[in-house]
From Swiss-Prot:
Keywords: Cell inner membrane, Cell membrane, Membrane, Protein transport, Translocation, Transmembrane, Transmembrane helix, Transport
Coiled coil: none
Protein name per the record: Sec-independent protein translocase protein TatB
Subunit structure: The Tat system comprises two distinct complexes: a TatABC complex, containing multiple copies of TatA, TatB and TatC subunits, and a separate TatA complex, containing only TatA subunits. Substrates initially bind to the TatABC complex, which probably triggers association of the separate TatA complex to form the active translocon.
Keyword Transmembrane: yes
Source species taxonomy: Bacteria, Pseudomonadati, Pseudomonadota, Gammaproteobacteria, Alteromonadales
GO molecular function: protein transmembrane transporter activity
UniProt KW Ribonucleoprotein keyword: no
Membrane topology per record: Single-pass membrane protein
Transmembrane segments: 2-22
Annotated organism of origin: Shewanella woodyi (strain ATCC 51908 / MS32)
Any one Pfam family match given in the protein's UniProt record, by short name: TatA_B_E
Record region (Disordered): 68-132
Amino acid sequence: MFDGIGFMELLLIGILGLVVLGPERLPVAVRSITGWIRAMKRMANSVKDELEQELKIEQLHSDLKKAENQGLKDLSPELQDSIDQLKEAAQSVNRPYKIEETPSASSSAPSESTPSEAPTAEVSANPDKSNR
């Protein structure tokens, strides 16, 4: 973490912090600084992960274009693996939607018909009372 800072420099920073902030505020300041450092590390790791994912997607796209140019015949094992990964990803994306649509459609249909009838009856009864 402190690659360019030696022990003496850390000791000097600690003593200066103790003199400037005092013994009561120094622990709070150290905690807040370590929190900032953790947040920056998390952000950096998040950006790194997103870039790696985008590079992997870009590599898969380029492999797919190479496969299209070769006519999907006599593909190298590397290109075939990329195509298989794309097919698996497409299937995994489609599967959750198919599973969710079936139960929600059957469970929402009876519940929607019953409430829609009740408010209709209430609405038709309310205008008669307000006109009298």
